[in-house]
Design a protein with these regions (language model features):
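Metzincin-family zinc-dependent endopeptidase catalytic domain
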Residues: 43-143, 149-153
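Short, intrinsically disordered low-complexity segments
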Residues: 1-2, 64, 148, 174
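Residue-level signal for functionally critical sites in structured catalytic/ligand-binding pockets
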Residues: 2, 14, 54, 103-107, ...
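Second-shell loop/turn segments in exported
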Residues: 32-43, 109-120, 170-177
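Acidic/histidine-rich, surface-exposed loop or edge segments in extracytoplasmic proteins
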Residues: 24-38, 102-109, 163-170
């Protein structure tokens, strides 16, 4: 490997570490899902993403849906996709450094068939909720926290997940969580 590539690899690896900010360990994080602009079944896919992170956290925190926007720590909205699939703004408390709220936006539309659409909504919600709980981007394309950087990344990523499914009912189940062992390790390390 040329020396310049090694330096670039080290810089990328350093840039893809876990944030120091996270929610208080043991907390219940209330999540409100905005019905405005939500695709059919979109709220159910976000709930599956919440359950996936809750299971991976292994009692370090719990995500729970709430009907009350004002008391939610995380608020999820849907938007018409531009060049992004989603985005998140997480806010830490200035005194404690702990996360106290986050705004998550997930694309309500996607190219492809109905299954592709469900996959994009679920995996985007999973990725963006990962940011909302304190995780940064990863350089490993096997991770849900992977940052698309190359042409074709999104097709490879979503297509790879689709190949693991037997049916749409597998989305967000133990058979197809969308998390890699590294995602789980990073999460648990952040909340130790």
């Amino acid at each position: 490997m040329p020396r310049s590539w090694m330096v670039t690899s080290v810089v990328l690896a350093a840039a893809c570490t876990v944030n120091a900010a996270h929610w208080a360990t043991g907390t219940t994080i209330r999540v409100w899902i905005d019905p405005a602009g939500a695709p059919a079944g979109g709220d159910r896919l976000v709930e599956r993403a919440m359950q996936t992170w809750t299971m991976a956290a292994d009692s370090r925190f719990r995500m729970e849906r709430t009907a009350a926007r004002d008391t939610a720590g995380i608020r999820v909205h849907f938007f018409t996709r531009d060049w992004r699939f989603g985005m998140t703004q997480a806010r830490p408390d200035s005194r404690t450094g702990l996360l106290t709220e986050a705004e998550v936006v997930v694309a309500a539309d996607a190219d492809g068939d109905a299954l592709d659409h469900q996959i994009v909504v679920y995996l985007t919600a999973l990725h963006e909720l990962g940011h909302a709980i304190g995780l940064s981007h990863s350089a490993d394309s096997a991770d849900i926290m992977y940052l698309f950087r190359l042409p074709g990344d999104s097709e490879r990523f979503f297509g790879g997940y689709r190949r693991r499914l037997r049916s749409p009912d597998d989305i967000g189940t133990a058979r197809a969580t969308g998390l890699s062992p590294s995602d789980v390790r990073e999460l648990r390390g952040l909340y130790e």
